[in-house]
Protein backbone atom coordinates (compact mmCIF):
# COMPACT_ATOMS: atom_id res chain seq x y z
CA UNK A 1 0.00 0.00 0.00
CA UNK A 2 1.32 3.40 -0.96
CA UNK A 3 1.95 5.88 1.78
CA UNK A 4 1.56 9.36 0.38
CA UNK A 5 3.63 12.11 1.99
CA UNK A 6 1.90 14.96 0.16
CA UNK A 7 -1.14 15.75 -1.95
CA UNK A 8 -0.41 17.91 -4.99
CA UNK A 9 -3.22 19.72 -6.76
CA UNK A 10 -2.22 21.28 -10.05
CA UNK A 11 -3.96 22.73 -13.06
CA UNK A 12 -3.94 25.66 -15.45
CA UNK A 13 -5.09 29.12 -14.50
CA UNK A 14 -8.88 29.46 -14.04
CA UNK A 15 -9.37 25.73 -13.40
CA UNK A 16 -10.64 26.19 -9.84
CA UNK A 17 -7.80 24.32 -8.15
CA UNK A 18 -7.52 26.65 -5.13
CA UNK A 19 -11.21 26.33 -4.22
CA UNK A 20 -10.91 22.56 -4.41
CA UNK A 21 -7.63 22.45 -2.47
CA UNK A 22 -9.12 24.53 0.35
CA UNK A 23 -12.20 22.30 0.58
CA UNK A 24 -9.99 19.20 0.65
CA UNK A 25 -7.78 20.78 3.33
CA UNK A 26 -10.87 21.43 5.45
CA UNK A 27 -11.89 17.78 5.07
CA UNK A 28 -8.42 16.53 6.06
CA UNK A 29 -7.76 19.18 8.72
CA UNK A 30 -4.55 20.22 7.04
CA UNK A 31 -2.82 23.22 5.45
CA UNK A 32 -1.92 24.41 1.96
CA UNK A 33 1.49 25.24 0.53
CA UNK A 34 1.17 27.49 -2.51
CA UNK A 35 3.08 26.74 -5.72
CA UNK A 36 2.53 30.03 -7.52
CA UNK A 37 5.55 32.04 -8.63
CA UNK A 38 3.76 35.39 -8.39
CA UNK A 39 1.47 35.00 -5.38
CA UNK A 40 4.57 35.10 -3.21
CA UNK A 41 4.59 38.91 -3.66
CA UNK A 42 2.79 41.23 -1.27
CA UNK A 43 0.42 43.85 -2.75
CA UNK A 44 0.19 41.90 -6.02
CA UNK A 45 -3.25 40.57 -5.17
CA UNK A 46 -5.78 41.13 -7.96
CA UNK A 47 -3.32 40.54 -10.79
CA UNK A 48 -2.09 37.24 -9.36
CA UNK A 49 -5.58 36.05 -8.45
CA UNK A 50 -4.85 35.33 -4.81
CA UNK A 51 -8.55 35.06 -4.00
CA UNK A 52 -7.73 34.65 -0.31
CA UNK A 53 -11.44 34.29 0.47
CA UNK A 54 -11.17 30.79 -1.05
CA UNK A 55 -9.19 29.75 2.02
CA UNK A 56 -12.25 30.26 4.21
CA UNK A 57 -14.38 27.12 3.97
CA UNK A 58 -17.74 27.28 5.73
CA UNK A 59 -16.31 29.67 8.28
CA UNK A 60 -13.12 27.66 8.80
CA UNK A 61 -9.89 29.46 7.91
CA UNK A 62 -7.46 27.16 6.11
CA UNK A 63 -3.82 28.03 6.88
CA UNK A 64 -1.76 28.73 3.77
CA UNK A 65 1.97 29.14 3.23
CA UNK A 66 4.34 30.82 0.71
CA UNK A 67 1.91 33.58 -0.18
CA UNK A 68 2.82 37.23 0.55
CA UNK A 69 6.43 36.51 1.55
CA UNK A 70 8.32 39.00 -0.68
CA UNK A 71 8.06 42.65 -1.68
CA UNK A 72 7.27 43.58 -5.31
CA UNK A 73 10.44 44.20 -7.29
CA UNK A 74 12.33 41.29 -5.74
CA UNK A 75 13.27 38.51 -8.17
CA UNK A 76 12.38 35.35 -6.28
CA UNK A 77 13.44 32.12 -7.95
CA UNK A 78 12.91 28.36 -7.93
CA UNK A 79 16.09 27.85 -5.86
CA UNK A 80 14.60 29.94 -3.05
CA UNK A 81 11.20 28.34 -3.46
CA UNK A 82 12.61 24.85 -3.05
CA UNK A 83 14.28 25.78 0.24
CA UNK A 84 11.20 27.65 1.51
CA UNK A 85 8.95 24.75 0.58
CA UNK A 86 10.96 22.14 2.44
CA UNK A 87 11.15 24.35 5.54
CA UNK A 88 7.34 24.55 5.64
CA UNK A 89 6.85 20.93 4.56
CA UNK A 90 9.10 19.51 7.29
CA UNK A 91 7.37 21.65 9.92
CA UNK A 92 3.95 20.38 8.83
CA UNK A 93 5.13 16.77 8.86
CA UNK A 94 6.46 17.23 12.41
CA UNK A 95 3.00 18.45 13.39
CA UNK A 96 1.38 15.36 11.92
CA UNK A 97 -0.21 17.07 8.91
CA UNK A 98 -0.53 15.72 5.37
CA UNK A 99 0.43 18.85 3.40
CA UNK A 100 -1.43 19.93 0.28
CA UNK A 101 0.68 21.58 -2.42
CA UNK A 102 -1.49 23.65 -4.76
CA UNK A 103 -0.57 25.78 -7.74
CA UNK A 104 0.09 26.16 -11.42
CA UNK A 105 3.84 26.82 -11.52
CA UNK A 106 4.98 23.46 -12.84
CA UNK A 107 8.66 24.24 -12.42
CA UNK A 108 8.19 24.84 -8.68
CA UNK A 109 6.07 21.71 -8.27
CA UNK A 110 8.49 19.44 -10.08
CA UNK A 111 11.52 20.88 -8.28
CA UNK A 112 10.10 19.90 -4.89
CA UNK A 113 8.53 16.58 -5.86
CA UNK A 114 11.77 15.33 -7.39
CA UNK A 115 14.12 17.09 -4.97
CA UNK A 116 16.37 18.39 -7.74
CA UNK A 117 19.61 19.97 -6.62
CA UNK A 118 19.31 23.59 -7.73
CA UNK A 119 22.02 26.20 -7.72
CA UNK A 120 21.68 29.87 -6.83
CA UNK A 121 22.94 31.07 -10.20
CA UNK A 122 24.80 34.41 -10.17
CA UNK A 123 24.42 37.02 -12.90
CA UNK A 124 26.82 36.92 -15.85
CA UNK A 125 27.31 40.54 -17.05
CA UNK A 126 29.31 39.56 -20.15
CA UNK A 127 26.69 37.08 -21.30
CA UNK A 128 23.90 39.56 -20.63
CA UNK A 129 25.65 42.21 -22.70
CA UNK A 130 26.11 39.79 -25.61
CA UNK A 131 22.37 39.01 -25.58
CA UNK A 132 21.09 42.51 -24.88
CA UNK A 133 20.06 43.44 -28.44
CA UNK A 134 18.50 40.12 -29.43
CA UNK A 135 14.75 39.81 -29.94
CA UNK A 136 12.61 37.56 -27.78
CA UNK A 137 12.24 35.17 -30.73
CA UNK A 138 16.03 34.95 -31.14
CA UNK A 139 16.46 34.31 -27.42
CA UNK A 140 13.81 31.56 -27.50
CA UNK A 141 15.72 29.92 -30.37
CA UNK A 142 18.88 29.90 -28.24
CA UNK A 143 16.95 28.38 -25.32
CA UNK A 144 15.55 25.67 -27.57
CA UNK A 145 19.10 24.54 -28.37
CA UNK A 146 19.74 23.25 -24.84
CA UNK A 147 19.11 19.55 -24.30
CA UNK A 148 17.70 20.03 -20.80
CA UNK A 149 16.16 23.19 -19.42
CA UNK A 150 16.71 23.66 -15.69
CA UNK A 151 14.61 26.81 -15.67
CA UNK A 152 11.58 26.73 -17.97
CA UNK A 153 9.99 29.72 -16.34
CA UNK A 154 7.69 31.70 -18.59
CA UNK A 155 9.96 33.53 -21.02
CA UNK A 156 7.38 36.08 -22.08
CA UNK A 157 9.89 38.92 -21.81
CA UNK A 158 13.43 39.25 -23.17
CA UNK A 159 14.71 39.82 -19.63
CA UNK A 160 13.33 36.47 -18.49
CA UNK A 161 14.68 34.70 -21.56
CA UNK A 162 18.16 36.11 -20.94
CA UNK A 163 17.99 34.93 -17.32
CA UNK A 164 16.98 31.44 -18.49
CA UNK A 165 19.97 31.32 -20.89
CA UNK A 166 22.22 32.54 -18.09
CA UNK A 167 21.06 29.65 -15.92
CA UNK A 168 21.64 27.07 -18.66
CA UNK A 169 25.17 28.32 -19.32
CA UNK A 170 25.97 28.11 -15.61
CA UNK A 171 24.56 24.59 -15.27
CA UNK A 172 26.66 23.39 -18.22
CA UNK A 173 29.80 23.71 -16.11
CA UNK A 174 28.71 23.87 -12.47
CA UNK A 175 25.79 21.61 -11.64
CA UNK A 176 26.39 18.16 -10.11
CA UNK A 177 23.86 15.55 -11.21
CA UNK A 178 22.51 14.76 -7.74
CA UNK A 179 19.42 15.40 -5.67
CA UNK A 180 19.57 17.82 -2.76
CA UNK A 181 16.35 16.54 -1.16
CA UNK A 182 14.68 13.16 -1.14
CA UNK A 183 11.95 12.87 -3.78
CA UNK A 184 8.45 13.07 -2.30
CA UNK A 185 5.85 10.36 -2.81
CA UNK A 186 2.92 12.59 -3.66
CA UNK A 187 -0.58 11.88 -4.81
CA UNK A 188 -0.94 14.25 -7.77
CA UNK A 189 -4.40 15.45 -8.72
CA UNK A 190 -4.73 17.45 -11.94
CA UNK A 191 -7.76 19.63 -12.57
CA UNK A 192 -8.72 19.16 -16.21
CA UNK A 193 -10.75 21.93 -17.79
CA UNK A 194 -12.01 21.88 -21.36
CA UNK A 195 -10.07 24.28 -23.58
CA UNK A 196 -13.09 26.34 -24.62
CA UNK A 197 -14.42 26.57 -21.06
CA UNK A 198 -10.95 27.57 -19.88
CA UNK A 199 -10.76 30.33 -22.48
CA UNK A 200 -14.22 31.57 -21.53
CA UNK A 201 -13.35 31.65 -17.82
CA UNK A 202 -10.02 33.40 -18.45
CA UNK A 203 -11.69 36.12 -20.53
CA UNK A 204 -14.49 36.63 -18.02
CA UNK A 205 -12.10 36.70 -15.07
CA UNK A 206 -9.85 39.25 -16.76
CA UNK A 207 -12.73 41.67 -17.16
CA UNK A 208 -13.83 41.09 -13.57
CA UNK A 209 -10.35 41.86 -12.28
CA UNK A 210 -10.17 45.03 -14.34
CA UNK A 211 -13.50 46.06 -12.82
CA UNK A 212 -12.16 45.24 -9.34
CA UNK A 213 -9.33 47.75 -9.68
CA UNK A 214 -6.39 45.85 -11.14
CA UNK A 215 -5.12 48.97 -12.93
CA UNK A 216 -5.13 50.93 -9.67
CA UNK A 217 -3.31 48.07 -7.95
CA UNK A 218 -0.44 48.39 -10.42
CA UNK A 219 -0.44 52.19 -10.16
CA UNK A 220 -0.15 51.88 -6.37
CA UNK A 221 2.78 49.46 -6.63
CA UNK A 222 4.59 51.77 -9.06
CA UNK A 223 3.91 54.72 -6.72
CA UNK A 224 5.86 52.94 -3.96
CA UNK A 225 9.00 53.20 -6.08
CA UNK A 226 9.02 49.83 -7.82
CA UNK A 227 10.54 50.35 -11.27
CA UNK A 228 8.31 49.70 -14.30
CA UNK A 229 10.84 47.23 -15.71
CA UNK A 230 10.70 45.23 -12.48
CA UNK A 231 6.93 44.82 -12.77
CA UNK A 232 7.22 44.06 -16.49
CA UNK A 233 9.62 41.25 -15.51
CA UNK A 234 6.74 39.38 -13.82
CA UNK A 235 4.89 39.14 -17.13
CA UNK A 236 1.18 38.78 -17.83
CA UNK A 237 -1.02 41.27 -15.94
CA UNK A 238 1.87 43.23 -14.47
CA UNK A 239 3.68 43.48 -17.80
CA UNK A 240 0.74 44.71 -19.87
CA UNK A 241 -0.84 46.92 -17.21
CA UNK A 242 2.51 48.62 -16.62
CA UNK A 243 2.94 49.19 -20.36
CA UNK A 244 -0.52 50.77 -20.39
CA UNK A 245 0.18 52.97 -17.37
CA UNK A 246 3.48 54.27 -18.77
CA UNK A 247 1.78 55.07 -22.08
CA UNK A 248 3.19 52.39 -24.35
CA UNK A 249 -0.18 50.70 -24.93
CA UNK A 250 -3.73 52.01 -25.21
CA UNK A 251 -6.31 50.48 -22.88
CA UNK A 252 -7.81 48.45 -25.73
CA UNK A 253 -4.37 47.21 -26.84
CA UNK A 254 -3.53 46.27 -23.26
CA UNK A 255 -6.70 44.24 -22.76
CA UNK A 256 -6.39 42.48 -26.12
CA UNK A 257 -2.70 41.60 -25.77
CA UNK A 258 -3.08 40.56 -22.13
CA UNK A 259 -6.00 38.27 -22.90
CA UNK A 260 -3.98 36.53 -25.62
CA UNK A 261 -0.97 36.22 -23.29
CA UNK A 262 -3.03 34.59 -20.52
CA UNK A 263 -4.47 32.05 -22.96
CA UNK A 264 -0.93 31.25 -24.14
CA UNK A 265 0.22 30.97 -20.52
CA UNK A 266 -2.52 28.43 -19.71
CA UNK A 267 -1.48 26.40 -22.75
CA UNK A 268 2.15 26.43 -21.56
CA UNK A 269 1.04 25.26 -18.12
CA UNK A 270 -0.70 22.25 -19.65
CA UNK A 271 2.36 21.53 -21.79
CA UNK A 272 4.48 21.46 -18.64
CA UNK A 273 2.08 19.11 -16.82
CA UNK A 274 2.04 16.73 -19.79
CA UNK A 275 5.83 16.86 -19.71
CA UNK A 276 5.77 15.90 -16.03
CA UNK A 277 3.79 12.81 -16.98
CA UNK A 278 6.37 11.90 -19.61
CA UNK A 279 9.06 12.35 -16.97
CA UNK A 280 7.43 9.80 -14.70
CA UNK A 281 4.87 11.72 -12.62
CA UNK A 282 1.50 9.98 -12.39
CA UNK A 283 -1.23 12.62 -12.51
CA UNK A 284 -4.83 11.65 -11.74
CA UNK A 285 -6.97 14.04 -13.78
CA UNK A 286 -10.35 15.17 -12.42
CA UNK A 287 -12.95 17.09 -14.44
CA UNK A 288 -13.06 20.73 -13.35
CA UNK A 289 -16.84 20.84 -13.80
CA UNK A 290 -17.52 18.17 -11.16
CA UNK A 291 -19.01 19.45 -7.90
CA UNK A 292 -16.42 19.98 -5.16
CA UNK A 293 -17.89 17.11 -3.12
CA UNK A 294 -17.34 14.69 -6.00
CA UNK A 295 -13.77 15.91 -6.48
CA UNK A 296 -13.11 15.29 -2.78
CA UNK A 297 -14.73 11.84 -2.88
CA UNK A 298 -12.64 10.83 -5.91
CA UNK A 299 -9.46 12.10 -4.27
CA UNK A 300 -10.22 10.24 -1.04
CA UNK A 301 -10.76 6.99 -2.94
CA UNK A 302 -7.40 7.38 -4.66
CA UNK A 303 -5.77 8.39 -1.38
CA UNK A 304 -7.11 5.23 0.22
CA UNK A 305 -5.86 3.16 -2.74
CA UNK A 306 -9.34 2.28 -3.94
CA UNK A 307 -8.69 3.47 -7.49
UniProtKB/Swiss-Prot annotation:
Superkingdom of the source species: Bacteria
Binding positions (ATP): 11-18
Stretch list, region Interaction with substrate tRNA: 36-39, 159-163
Binding, substrate: 13-18
Recorded catalytic activity of this chain's protein: adenosine(37) in tRNA + dimethylallyl diphosphate = N(6)-dimethylallyladenosine(37) in tRNA + diphosphate
Family: Belongs to the IPP transferase family.
Name of the protein: tRNA dimethylallyltransferase 1
Organism expressing this protein natively: Parabacteroides distasonis (strain ATCC 8503 / DSM 20701 / CIP 104284 / JCM 5825 / NCTC 11152)
Amino acid sequence: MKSYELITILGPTASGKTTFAAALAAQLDTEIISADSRQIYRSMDIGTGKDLADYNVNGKQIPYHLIDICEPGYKYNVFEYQHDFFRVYEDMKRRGKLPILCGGTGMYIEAVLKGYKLLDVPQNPELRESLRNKTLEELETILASYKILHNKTDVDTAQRAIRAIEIEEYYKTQAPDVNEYNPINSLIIGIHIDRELRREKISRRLRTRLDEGMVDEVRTILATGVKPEDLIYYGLEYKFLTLYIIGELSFEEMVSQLEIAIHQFAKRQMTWFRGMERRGCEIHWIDATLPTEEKIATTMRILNNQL
